[in-house]
Amino acid sequence: MFHLLTNCNVCSHCLRELDAKFISFKVGKYKALAIYEYDDRIKSLLYQFKGCFDIEIADIFLIRYVRELKIMYEGYVVVPIPSYKEDDEIREFNHVVEMFKILKLKMAPLLIKTKKIKQADRSLKERQEINKYLELTNQTELKGKKVLLVDDVYTTGSTMKAAINLVEQCHPKKIEILVMSKSPFKDLKEE
């Protein structure tokens, strides 16, 4: 289904290190696809990208599969899961936007995170409260559109579910999810 690009500017050693899994799953009733399983290699590359502000490696995560992903999601509006604004300002880029802009699909960063919280540092119960800290800035832009929610790592699903709840209020034609990686942890169950 997917092929390897050979004419890219990313180190071939780094590309070989990435082992795509193409994990299909559901978030509620919505189809989702994760390209990689979240493992030590992905964790290390994400740290280099986000933590060390290495924007030059933004393309490494998706470059091998751009053609196929563009075909799969043609006509979708890409809505990235947000970072806290101040974190983006320190980094001088939004890592999710930079990671997915290689797809050259319409990007609509309409979600904002209103408080600096790191999901990884929170308990499962606290993670479910993420909806208190996400807002949608424009409800009309997504009405009747095919929406692709994108993120770097899908762990428990709390953030994605909160984003879906906001996007559903816009009455989109369709919602799908694409994440660069998925943690092997189970999703939080609806209570």
Which role does the model predict for each range below?
Residues K106-M107, K146, K173-E176:
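Residues at the starts of beta-strands that form the adenosine-phosphate
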Residues F2-T6, D19:
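Short functional micro-motifs and their immediate structural scaffolds
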Residues L105-P109, E191:
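Active-site regions of enzymes building and remodeling cell-envelope glycoconjugates
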Residues P80, P109, L149, I177-V179:
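Structural beta-sheet core signal
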Residues R67, E98-L105, K161, N165, ...:
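Short, well-ordered alpha-helices that flank and scaffold nucleotide-derived cofactor binding pockets
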Residues V10-V77, Y84-F93, K101, I112-E141, ...:
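Active-site-facing substrate-recognition patch
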Residues A162-E191:
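PRPP-dependent phosphoribosyltransferase catalytic core
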Residues L149-A163:
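A phosphate-binding catalytic loop at a beta-strand-loop-alpha-helix junction
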